[in-house]
From Swiss-Prot:
GO cellular component labels: extracellular region
Tissue: Expressed by the venom gland.
Disulfide bond residue pairs: C3-C17, C10-C22, C16-C29
Location in or out of the cell: Secreted
General remark: Negative results: does not have effect on TRPV2, TRPV3, TRPV4, TRPA1, TRPM8, Kv1.2/KCNA2 or Kv4.2/KCND2.
Family statement: Belongs to the neurotoxin 10 (Hwtx-1) family. 62 (Vatx) subfamily.
GO MF annotations in UniProt: ion channel inhibitor activity; potassium channel regulator activity; toxin activity
Keyword Methyltransferase part of the UniProt annotation: no
Record's function text: Selectively activates the mammalian capsaicin receptor TRPV1, a non-selective cation channel expressed by sensory neurons of the pain pathway. Is more potent than VaTx1, but less potent than VaTx3. Interacts with distinct regions of the channel than capsaicin, since it only acts on the extracellular face of the channel, and capsaicin binds to the cytosolic side. Also activates avian TRPV1, which is insensitive to capsaicin. Produce weak inhibition on potassium channels Kv2.1/KCNB1.
Name the record gives this protein: Tau-theraphotoxin-Pc1b
Keyword terms: Amidation, Disulfide bond, Ion channel impairing toxin, Knottin, Neurotoxin, Potassium channel impairing toxin, Secreted, Toxin, Voltage-gated potassium channel impairing toxin
Modified residues (Phenylalanine amide): F35
Length: 35
């Protein structure tokens, strides 16, 4: 399936697009600090 963009809902980092990570407990994708 499609990856989740910034502030998209997620269950794990693998749900998120490149350079995003799933914020545990908040359940959304946010920048992981990489370029």
């Amino acid at each position: 399936g499609a990856c989740r963009w910034f502030l998209g809902g997620c269950k794990s980092t693998s749900d998120c697009c490149e350079h995003l990570s799933c914020k545990m407990g908040l359940d959304y994708c946010a920048w992981d600090g990489t370029f």
